Amino acid sequence: MEAAVDDRQLLAKLGAGRLSGDALARELGQTRAAIWKRIQGLRAAGVEIDGRAGDGYQLQQRMELLDSASILGALPAPLAERLDSLEVAWSVGSTNSELLRCSAPERGARVLLAERQTGGRGRRGRAWA
């Protein structure tokens, strides 16, 4: 998988309520500057984060992130048994490209889902709408 900072922990904290940059830095074991950079990256990716000086940060809307265990649990047993693996990545260029880099599974299908694709494209090279 493409190396990318996994911001799921940060998003979970921001979704739980308003927290200061200092509190986020302490809880995630990072500097306040690193938290600020990650928040700016999330904003650039389209995540709406409310931030007020002296009041902290909070998601403007609740986000439900992909969870492989929940997805597998919701699949009918005969379908789940046909899967070799089901992985959830934070950010990849293209799920299709990532899967093509892997060797074919000996049995079943390999599934890769991503919260964010930075280089994905539609059929025949069309851009995503």
Residue positions per predicted region:
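N-terminal lobe of the biotin/lipoate ligase/transferase fold
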Residues: 2-129
